[in-house]
């Protein structure tokens, strides 16, 4: 790679310390390959975004989970307009859904060749306007039960692993969460008022540590895949939960999929939102595609 060395932002607590240990081994591989990188560890929430915002035009690599990547991307995209930001992710967090859409090395010894190959994919990002202001997301957002699942998974035992942790949080949330009455407006004129379990606004294909929520989503087609999961009862939803991991839920009668560049969601009572596995306020909300916003280093 030419120019300034990449800035590597490591979240040392992501994945119960797995991200830190992965980078320690990767750093050894980079030194052995005579590859220079600048490394900094985060200490508190918000550090990753601030470091990325101040990184200039060089490649910024996130080492952590989806939440760390989410912060880095928001930092990159708040810089003044100019060159398209360059981003890479080494995923070792609780959920790590982004890597299912945008693969990166899983072995430390492969990190130097990943950097050396210099292969890029230009992708879209999502922009959310909600009760907490504006933020960007790269993988997916969720209006409804997803915010509850994220909250429960965040306090779950990491020793179980991301998928089991999120699955347990999903089952508990399904038992206590009440469906919401919402109004949905898409840019093609589609308008619907309905009771829903959740609405996924997907740029990537997965969320919730492996749920294949939008099987056909592509992060570079200029469109969200919007998956509306309707008025499922508690036990009905639990019975169909395995289909979310298989991606076959989209054939159910109470599930609707549409594609849109812009989506407005309002509700009778405020409904929680999560973006890339992070709490993101509540409805009313507007989601917009920002096309070709990010260059991602791919494996």
Region roles according to the model:
Residues 12, 63-65, 90-92, 203:
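Glycine-rich beta-strand-to-loop/alpha-helix junction loops that act as flexible
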Residues 1-63, 109:
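ATP/NTP phosphate-donor binding region
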Residues 43-46, 64-67, 93, 144, ...:
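Short beta->alpha linker loops
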Residues 10, 24, 33, 40-42, ...:
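Catalytic core of DAGKc-family lipid kinases
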Residues 157-165, 207-209, 215-236:
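Gly/Ser/Thr-rich active-site loops/lids in small-molecule metabolic enzymes
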Residues 142, 146, 200-215, 279:
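Glycine-rich phosphate/pyrophosphate-binding beta-alpha loops
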Residues 68-80:
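Short Gly/Thr/Asp-enriched flexible loops that form oxyanion-binding sites at enzyme active sites
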Residues 186-188, 193, 218-219, 228-299:
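ATP/nucleoside-binding phosphotransfer catalytic cores, i.e., glycine-rich phosphate-binding loops
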């Amino acid at each position: 790679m030419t120019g300034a060395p990449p800035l590597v932002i490591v979240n040392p607590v992501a994945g119960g310390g797995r991200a830190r240990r992965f980078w320690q081994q990767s750093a050894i591989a980079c030194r052995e390959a005579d590859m220079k990188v600048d490394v900094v560890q985060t200490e508190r929430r918000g550090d990753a975004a601030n470091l990325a915002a101040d990184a200039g035009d060089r490649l910024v690599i996130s080492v952590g989970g989806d939440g760390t990547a989410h912060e880095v991307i928001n930092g990159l995209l708040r810089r003044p307009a100019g060159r398209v930001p360059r981003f890479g992710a080494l995923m070792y967090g609780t959920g790590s859904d982004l890597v299912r859409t945008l693969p990166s090395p899983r072995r430390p010894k492969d990190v130097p060749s990943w950097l050396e190959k210099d292969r890029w994919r230009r992708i879209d990002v999502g922009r959310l306007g909600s009760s907490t202001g504006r933020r960007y997301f790269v993988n997916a957002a969720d209006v409804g039960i997803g915010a509850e699942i994220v909250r429960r998974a965040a306090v779950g035992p990491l020793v179980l692993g991301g998928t089991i942790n999120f699955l347990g949080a999903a089952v508990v949330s399904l038992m206590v969460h009440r469906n919401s009455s919402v109004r949905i407006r898409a840019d093609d004129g589609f308008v619907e008022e309905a009771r829903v379990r959740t609405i996924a606004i997907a740029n990537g294909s997965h969320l919730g540590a492996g749920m294949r929520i939008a099987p056909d989503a592509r992060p570079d087609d200029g469109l969200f895949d919007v998956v509306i999961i309707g008025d499922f009862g508690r036990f009905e939803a639990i019975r169909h939960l395995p289909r979310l991991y298989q991606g076959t839920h989209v054939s159910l009668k109470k599930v609707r999929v549409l594609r849109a560049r812009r989506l407005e969601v309002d509700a009778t009572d405020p409904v929680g939102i999560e973006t890339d596995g992070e709490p993101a306020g509540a409805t009313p909300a507007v989601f917009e595609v920002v096309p070709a916003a990010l260059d991602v280093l791919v494996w």
